[in-house]
């Protein structure tokens, strides 16, 4: 899917060099079709890196995707130039009157922080509640999935004894839903989190449909019956080197982390890691965009209202 982004956004140059179809504002102005409007709430410290990763995932379809970048507070980022944030990001007050086809809320390095201690927790609650009536489908990634379970279902934070880091096998539990169309019965996906998503706990306390689960990592992919909220507990958008950089960051910080599981050849951090989840990541985002966003969203977003009930898919 050609993604429509500002001409000067750093991701435009990077993705163009990768032969990914990027449509700048000037070119998109000559196409007389309505692009899908996707809002990205980027909570990750390295914002440019995350922008590139997610825009890469959104790029494989013949439709335009117009991406708006959202920031949640005015604190200066230690890892992203201030001028970049001021140039390309909007705050909630600037977009709250808009409606969107899709919303992606990223993870955040807050696994050991209680929700009430998160500086922007109240604003995040406001955004999630706002999305119910102003977004067709919202995709929550990693920490955002845990935060959404708290906001939408009242579930308290469940934390693992040690950080889960690595690439794990997952079993597809649902055959018919289009969100998992084309998934292998067993597939790999990366995780980097302290959050726990045990299947029994999720099943006992929510009405979510669970689509994929791992013996080591727990629930990986779930969604509400009306497809309006999608929960991904891992990081399918990660580049091949992202877990590597996080591992060395933790080493430098003296955390003494475990070597990411199933990641380095021979479990040797000196060897270049495999990117064994690439095809899965692209397929997950493509399915979400096509079936949960494009197929369900109204042409006139002003008519968007909260849907009720499930969707009868014809497979």
Swiss-Prot record:
Can you state which reaction this protein catalyses? Answer: L-homoserine + succinyl-CoA = O-succinyl-L-homoserine + CoA
Please name the Pfam families in this protein's record: HTS (PF04204)
Q: Give the UniProt subcellular location, in the record's own words.
A: Cytoplasm
GO terms classed as biological process: L-methionine biosynthetic process from homoserine via O-succinyl-L-homoserine and cystathionine
Where does the record place the site Important for acyl-CoA specificity? 111
Recorded GO molecular functions are: homoserine O-acetyltransferase activity; homoserine O-succinyltransferase activity
Q: What class of enzyme is it?
A: transferase
HAMAP family annotated for this entry? MetA_acyltransf (MF_00295)
Described by its record, this protein's role is as follows:
Transfers a succinyl group from succinyl-CoA to L-homoserine, forming succinyl-L-homoserine.
What name does this protein carry?
Homoserine O-succinyltransferase
Origin species: Tolumonas auensis (strain DSM 9187 / NBRC 110442 / TA 4)
